[in-house]
């Protein structure tokens, strides 16, 4: 109220993370921890479809991971770690970490750390790309949970307390590039004969248009591949659906990998990306 009285021209909120509710149907900015505190990483897109106002500005999202500067963890008796000390002093979220990535399921500390970092990268990549695809429709911006730790911690940061990058640091930088190509998130498992339709979008945050943008998509599986090419202009500061990957899952064991490459022919700018995760044929096991 003091802020409102001082400057009524500026909107004010009591605090962030308030979902829409009666009588304040707009809510405030959102804290959406899909893939960590609830659900899966792709559930952010589901929430956006069902309640668009929840993603107008998302100010917290991500997943915790073990940092590279990790002497404080104490792993001389791996996999036995002092979880009480880590929870009290170093933000170790035992209830979640030990369900998703129980230390005793990993032979080494290094394998445990790498797995948590790869998962964090997956969550941030999927959700940043989702929010950018929804640019202005309705997303006006986002801020993932933590950039850098102020002290030794197992947290959602992408830089640890020594400013050593985690795996997610490069992932975030790539996902926040001025021009990206984004495809719909595929299911984790598929069966032979299933039909996949994944919409492909080009996001252009530059102040200049992409006059002749091309997207090349390639699906690869054991012994074969299928390709698609889409193209067209993309205005400055805009998002355009350039095409749809329409794939019938092959009758083969193993993984199906989908890769995308976006090229601005005139500017000779190229962006490549691999779809998050693998499509695993359910017959593989």
Spans of model-derived segments:
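Intrinsically disordered, low-complexity Pro/Gly/Ser/Thr-rich segments with frequent PxxP/GP/PP motifs
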Residues: 213, 224-253
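Terminal connector regions
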Residues: 241-243, 248-285
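Surface-exposed loop/turn motifs at beta-strand-loop junctions within extracellular Ig-like
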Residues: 204, 221, 262-266
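Substrate-binding clefts and catalytic carboxylate motifs of secreted carbohydrate-active enzymes
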Residues: 3-4, 13, 40-212, 216-220, ...
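A generic structural motif
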Residues: 14, 230, 273-275
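C-terminal cap/loop subdomain of S1 sulfatases and analogous C-terminal strand-loop tails that border
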Residues: 19-49
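A general structural motif
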Residues: 9, 139, 253-255
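Active-site neighborhood of glycoside hydrolase catalytic domains
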Residues: 1-23
């Amino acid at each position: 109220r003091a802020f409102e009285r001082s400057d009524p021209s500026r909107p004010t909120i009591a605090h962030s993370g308030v979902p829409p509710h009666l009588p304040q149907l707009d809510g405030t900015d959102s804290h959406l921890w899909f893939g960590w505190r609830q659900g899966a990483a792709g559930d952010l897109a589901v929430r956006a479809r069902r309640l668009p106002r929840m993603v107008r500005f998302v100010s917290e999202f991500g997943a915790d991971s073990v940092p590279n500067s990790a002497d404080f963890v104490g792993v001389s008796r791996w996999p036995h770690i002092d979880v009480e000390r880590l929870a009290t002093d170093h933000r170790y979220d035992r209830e979640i970490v030990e369900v998703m990535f129980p230390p005793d399921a990993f032979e080494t500390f290094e394998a445990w750390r790498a797995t948590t970092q790869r998962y964090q990268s997956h969550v941030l990549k999927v959700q940043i790309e989702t929010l950018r695809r929804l640019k202005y429709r309705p997303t006006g911006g986002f801020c993932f949970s933590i950039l850098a730790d102020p002290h030794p911690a197992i947290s959602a940061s992408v830089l640890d307390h020594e400013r050593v990058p985690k795996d997610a640091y490069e992932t975030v930088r790539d996902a926040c590039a001025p021009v990206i190509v984004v495809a719909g998130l595929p299911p984790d498992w598929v069966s032979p004969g299933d039909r996949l339709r994944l919409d492909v979008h080009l996001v252009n945050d530059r102040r200049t248009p992409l006059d002749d943008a091309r997207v090349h998509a390639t699906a690869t599986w054991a012994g074969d591949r299928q390709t698609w090419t889409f193209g067209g202009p993309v205005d400055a500061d805009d998002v355009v659906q350039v095409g749809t990957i329409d794939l019938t899952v092959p009758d083969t064991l193993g993984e199906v990998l989908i890769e995308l490459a976006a090229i601005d022919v005139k500017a000779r700018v190229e962006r490549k990306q691999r779809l998050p995760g693998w499509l695993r044929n359910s017959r593989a096991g």
